[in-house]
Amino acid sequence: MALLQIAEPGMSTAPHQHRLAVGIDLGTTNSLVATVRNSIPEVLTDEEGRALLPSVVHYMKNGHAQIGYKALAAQNTDPKNTIASVKRFMGRGLKDIAYVENLPYDFLDTPGMVQLKTVAGVKSPVEISAEILATLRQQAEDALGDELVGAVITVPAYFDDAQRQATKDAAKLAGLNVLRLLNEPTAAAIAYGLDNGSEGVFAVYDLGGGTFDVSILKLTKGVFEVLSTGGDSALGGDDFDHRLLCWIIEQAKLSPLSDEDLSVLMVKSREAKELLSTKAETHIDAALGSGEEVHLTVTAADFVKMTQHLVAKTITPTKKALRDADLTVDDVDGVVMVGGATRMPHIRKAVGEFFQATPLANIDPDKVVALGAAVQANLLAGNRAAGDDWLLLDVIPLSLGIETMGGLVEKVIPRNSTIPCARAQEFTTFKDGQTAMAIHIVQGERELVSDCRSLARFELRGIPPMAAGAARIRVTYQVDADGLLSVSARELRSGVEASISVKPSYGLADDQIAQMLQDSFKSADVDMALRALREEQVEAERIVLATQSALDADGALLTDDERNAVTSLLAAVQQSSKGDDHHAIKAAVEALAQGTEEFAARRMDRSVRTALSGKKLDEI
C-alpha cells in the first residue's frame, strides 16, 4: 500500500473490538481514572491498590517531578516546590486566586495565566496538571495493558472557556486524546442513572476540594437533561481546611509563620477535618520550625460552628439553581452527593434539611464522577455492549473513510457504528521529501473513491522532509452525538495539525443510502478485483520510484551490466503496471525486489562506512 497503515493497539476499526477509553476526574485534592470493563464502570488503581491519586506535584532540583503520594510527603519539607490544588490556578490570573497571601508558592503574575517559580524552573498550571494526567494515563495503560484511544475529563460546571481550554492543553501535554470535557455533576448523574435506574428530577450537590457545583437534572428513561446549574468556583473542602487553620493560629496565638510551618499546620487541619467526620473530637499537635508548639483539642461542634457560614454559602446557589429551573424543593425526587467534602456530617445534614430528603450517597462520593466519565468515554470510543439502552443513540448509516494512493478507500469508521464514536489510524508519506498530504474524506461502501460520496478535503502542510514511509500521520475521525464528523490529521514528530468538520448526513436521503448499499452488494466481487489491481499498481509505482532514486544517488556502485539488468527489471514492472493482471504486476515487483537485493546491500555497506569514517573504536 502506498499509504502504509501502522496498526495501533486499541484503535482498530473493527466494530467488534473493544477500544480502550477512560474517564478522568481531575480533582483539586485527588484525581482518579476509571474505565468500563464487561459493561461495568470501575476505578483503576495503582500498583499498590490505591484509587485516589493526590493532585500534588513536587519539583526537584534535578528537574524531575514526584507526583501523588510521594509529592504529598514533601509538602512539609519543601512547600514552595510542592504544588497542591493546582486546579484552582487553571486559566486564572493572580488576582483571581483566593487566599493567595496564605499560599507558600512563588507566583509570577504573567499575562493570561499565573505561573509558579520552582527549583525546576517556571511552571504553568497547565504543565503541573499535565504531570498528574500523565501519571493517570500511565496508571490506566498499565492496568489495561494497552494504549488508550482517549479520555473524557471532567471539569466543574462553572469553569469558563479559559479554564476548559487550559484543561484540554494539559491533557494534550500528557499525551491524552480528549474525547470530551464533561461537567462533573453530569458525570455523577450518568453514574447514578446506570447504577440505580433512577428517573425524575435530581439535584447534584458537588462539593470537591476547590469548587462547588450544583446541577438540577431531569432523568427520563436514561436520558439526562440539565435543567440548570449553579455554584462557586472558589469554594470547596480546601476552604474548610483554611478556616480550621485560622482557628489553630488564633487559639495558639502564633506569631507570623514561615511557609514550612504554614504547610505543616495546613496538613494538620486537613487531617483534623477528616477525623471529625467520624469522631466527636480530635487533638492537634505540632512542633513548628520557629520553636513554637501547638497542642489543641477541637470538637465536632467547634468545627460545625466555625464552618457553618461555608455550608450556608453552598445553599444560596442551590436555591438559585432551583429558581432557574422553575422548580421548588418539592419537585426534587432526590439529591446526589458528590465530592469528598460531602462526607462531613453537618454538610449532609444541611443538604438533607434543605431538600427535606436523605441525600443519596450509595456510590463513593470520591469515585462517582470518574465512574460516570468512564461510561461516557466508553460510548464516545464506540463501545456498546448488547443491552446498553440507557441512552438513545444513532448509528452511522454509511462507512466513513479516507482516500489512499491509487484512488482506494480505507474505511476508518464502519457503517452501523454507534455514535458518538472516535477512531484513529496512522498513515505515512509516499515520496521522499514529501512535506504535505491531501486528506480526502469519503462516505460509502465501495472500494474506489470514484464510487463513493466525497464529503470534504483539506491539507496537512509542514511535514518535515524525510524518506518515504518515515513520517507518521495520525488521522482521527470523531462523530459526536449530533452526527457531526470532525477529522484531524497530525504529524506526530513535528506536531503540525490540520482539521475540518462536516455533517455526513447533510443532503443524503434514506433512498440514496439504500441505493448506495445495494450498489456495494452488487459490485462487491468487481470492486475487490479492482482493489487488488490498484494495490499492486500503487506498490509497483512505489518500488519504481524508490529504485530510480537509489540509482540516481548510488548508481556508481553497479557495473554497467548490473545497471542494465536493474533497468530491464524496472521496465518490466512499468509495462506490467499498464495492464489489468494484478498477478503479473506482483510477479514483476517481486522480481525487481530480488534483482536489487545486492544493490541494497552495497548501499547499506557504504552508509555504514560513511557513518563510521573518522571515528575511533571507543567512540563507536
Curated annotation (Swiss-Prot):
PANTHER family: HEAT SHOCK PROTEIN 70KDA (PTHR19375)
NCBIfam families: HscA, PRK05183.1
GO molecular function, one term: ATP binding
Protein name in UniProt: Chaperone protein HscA homolog
Family label: Belongs to the heat shock protein 70 family.
Entry keyword Protein transport: no
Functional description taken from the UniProt entry: Chaperone involved in the maturation of iron-sulfur cluster-containing proteins. Has a low intrinsic ATPase activity which is markedly stimulated by HscB.
Domain of life per record: Bacteria
Disulphide bond pairs: none
Keywords, sorted A to Z: ATP-binding, Chaperone, Nucleotide-binding
GO BP term, pick one: iron-sulfur cluster assembly
Upper lineage: Bacteria, Pseudomonadati, Pseudomonadota, Betaproteobacteria, Burkholderiales
Keyword Nucleotide-binding: yes
